[in-house]
């Protein structure tokens, strides 16, 4: 196992044919601070450059796959605050620009463009998810070609109901959930169960959590037996079909809407906060009611 990373782990398995990347901030529920995202991009590119690697697994250590963006841990604050602990990425890629331009360029580079790059990685990628997959965690998962989930996994994007945002930066929701289910989940903040995700075709396999890592590896080994050219062209055929149906252009358009949403809140708050707050009628995201599954015969499921 590689010791080159602080926020992730990287190892090669199956005689080098499989690379496994694990988000490794379990104490922060694998919240995505800037250091984690930069390391994750480097790990994906490392696997892509390795001609022995055929399949890349992406998972998370701890009780859940990921809780999404890091919204303000001490570590995350230190990363963007000028000083000795500031992450270098907060001095480039638009970080020194003013107004909406700075946030737009930073989010484009580290949230949006990164995710699109991983979606088109020249390897087959498998997301190994468990526990909860919230908000920006959906982006990491959806960038993968296939998804293997543990029993009981839940999927939710609560940025609408808790931050007043129209969705995360890589807005693949209508393509993954379906149009009306996306509207329901975004407008209520409810979660999709793993069984529903399987029925939608979003999730390929569901296993007991205790067996998840083992079964995902077995699945990856099976996929790795496919000739690399055939695997790559099969992936490319599907991705190009989606892009020709409008996926790529829709992502770009929705990223722009996301930035408009940020600019709205920044203007409302005199350029202090680019998201909705309690004073805007939203719950405090730290103390908001628990996320519950969307149930067909209940307005809100029991907690």
Give, region by region, the residue ranges found by the protein language model.
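Glycine-rich phosphate-binding loop at the start of an alpha helix
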Residues: 68, 108, 112, 135, ...
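C-terminal alpha-helix plus adjacent terminal tail
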Residues: 1-16, 65, 73, 77, ...
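Charged catalytic carboxylate motif
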Residues: 35-39, 110, 117, 215, ...
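Hydrophobic/aromatic residues within transmembrane alpha-helices
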Residues: 21, 58, 70, 140-142, ...
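Conserved CoA-thioester-binding segment of acyl-CoA-metabolizing enzymes
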Residues: 1-63, 75, 301
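CoA-thioester-processing core
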Residues: 113-122, 128, 134-186, 215, ...
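Glycine- (often His-adjacent) and acidic-residue-rich active-site loop
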Residues: 60-113, 161
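Short acidic-hydrophobic, aromatic-tinged amphipathic segments that line or gate anion-handling sites
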Residues: 148-149, 203-212
């Amino acid at each position: 196992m590689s010791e080159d990373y602080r926020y992730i782990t990287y190892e090669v398995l199956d005689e080098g044919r499989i690379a496994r990347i694990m988000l490794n901030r379990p104490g922060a529920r694998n919240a995505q601070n800037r250091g984690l995202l930069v390391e994750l991009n480097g790990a994906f590119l490392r696997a892509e450059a390795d001609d022995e690697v055929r399949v890349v697994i992406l998972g998370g250590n701890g009780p859940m796959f990921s809780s999404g963006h890091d919204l303000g841990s001490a570590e995350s604050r230190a990363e963007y605050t000028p000083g000795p602990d500031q992450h270098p990425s907060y001095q480039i890629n638009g970080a020194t620009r003013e107004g909406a331009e700075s946030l737009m360029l930073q989010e484009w580079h580290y949230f949006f463009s990164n995710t699109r790059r991983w979606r088109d990685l020249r390897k087959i990628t498998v997301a190994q998810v468990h526990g909860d997959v919230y908000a920006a965690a959906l982006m990491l998962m959806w960038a993968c070609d296939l998804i293997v989930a543990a029993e009981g996994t839940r999927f939710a994007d609560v940025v609408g109901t808790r931050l007043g945002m129209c969705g995360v930066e890589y807005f693949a929701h209508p393509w993954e959930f379906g149009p009306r289910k996306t509207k329901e989940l975004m407008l209520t903040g409810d979660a999709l169960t793993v069984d529903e995700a399987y029925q939608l075709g979003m999730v390929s396999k569901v296993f007991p959590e205790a067996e998840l890592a083992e079964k995902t590896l077995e699945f990856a080994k099976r996929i790795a037996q496919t000739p690399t050219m055939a695997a790559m062209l099969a992936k490319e055929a599907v991705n190009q079909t989606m892009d020709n149906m409008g996926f790529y252009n829709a992502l770009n358009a929705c990223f722009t809407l996301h930035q408009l949403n940020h600019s709205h809140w920044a203007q409302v708050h005199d350029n202090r906060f680019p998201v909705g707050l309690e004073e805007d009628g939203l719950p405090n995201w730290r103390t908001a009611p628990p996320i519950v599954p969307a149930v067909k015969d209940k307005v809100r499921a029991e907690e």
